[in-house]
């Protein structure tokens, strides 16, 4: 039960961080307060950091909302490709 509650709270933190309601620094401070500076806290902070960096919603090489394509078309005129969680303009996947 405790493990499920922790997972649910963690997913809630990810949603809040990715929606932009509060910033990454505040989220990481809350993790330090609630979980502490240990291995689990470090993993939680790493996931929050990855989610906060993901401004174009690229997940596992898939442009889920089309934001990467729109961004690249607007800025460079090239096609946008998702590389993991990063958006790269005009650079296709090589694998």
From Swiss-Prot:
UniProt domain BetaSPN-type CS-alpha/beta: residue ranges: 55-95
Main subcellular localisation: secreted
Keyword Disulfide bond applies: yes
Compartment(s): Secreted
PROSITE patterns: BSPN_CSAB
A Pfam family annotated for this UniProt entry: Scorpion_toxin_alpha-beta
UniProt keyword Protein biosynthesis, yes or no: no
UniProt signal peptide: 1-19
Similarity section: Belongs to the long chain scorpion toxin family. Class 3 subfamily.
Protein name in UniProt: Scorpine-like peptide Smp76
